[in-house]
A protein has these predicted regions:
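Phosphodiester-processing cores and adjacent nucleic acid-binding clamps
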Residues: 1-193
Length: 193
């Protein structure tokens, strides 16, 4: 199953409608698929309904933007080390996970909105029950550390995320779209695991 996928609800990053997605997934013989739109869950119900109708198991997710510090901190992006929030894939394992996803997505807008709707690790730790975490794309914090060859810091953060999500609920995501940086990070992730 694809566990990191953007629909039309990921503005400027996703092109497929939820109904078209589940129809294609079914056509390919896949039994399940996740939708992890950037910073929102606007399409979650539409996706869930379409997947159920098509006989495909829907995995509800969310690609969170994680503030480099506190979600309450608002300052010029130029002052930030990386200039933006990190990405982190969150997947609901169960009903409690879905509730926590909705809390995180809502609080990202009401408490952490600064250019993007952001959460932080404090909020994630409070609402991690029932969630699975993936390191996301090259914009994920662990992956950025790997790319910079800061393996000790990447291992430390991976350990922290493993504690937040609980054993067996945090994974290093490997992507290969032919981008040299992804291949380099994949090698580092394999070394880290």
């Amino acid at each position: 199953a694809h566990l990191h996928l953007h629909s039309t609800y990921s503005l400027l990053d996703g092109a497929i409608r939820p109904a078209d997605l589940v129809n294609k997934v079914k056509e390919l013989g896949m039994k399940s698929v996740a939708v992890t739109d950037h910073g929102n869950m606007f399409g979650a119900i539409e996706f869930y309904d379409a997947a159920k109708k098509a006989g495909v198991k829907p995995i509800i997710g969310y690609e969170a933007y994680v503030a480099p510090g506190s979600r309450f901190e608002k300052r010029n992006q130029e002052d930030l080390v990386d200039g933006r929030a990190y990405h982190l894939i969150l997947l609901a394992k169960n009903k409690q996970g879905y509730k926590n996803l909705t809390k995180l997505a809502s609080k990202a807008y009401t408490e952490g909105l600064y250019y993007k709707p952001r959460i932080d690790y404090e909020l994630l730790a409070q609402h991690s029950e029932g969630l699975v975490g993936l390191t996301a794309c090259l914009a994920g914090e662990v992956n950025r550390l790997i790319y910079r060859q800061q393996m000790d810091k990447a291992a430390e953060l991976s350990g922290r995320l493993n504690e937040i999500f609980g054993k067996g609920n945090f994974f290093l995501e490997i992507q290969n779209h032919g981008i040299p940086e992804q291949i380099e990070v994949a090698k580092g992730a394999a070394e880290l695991s």
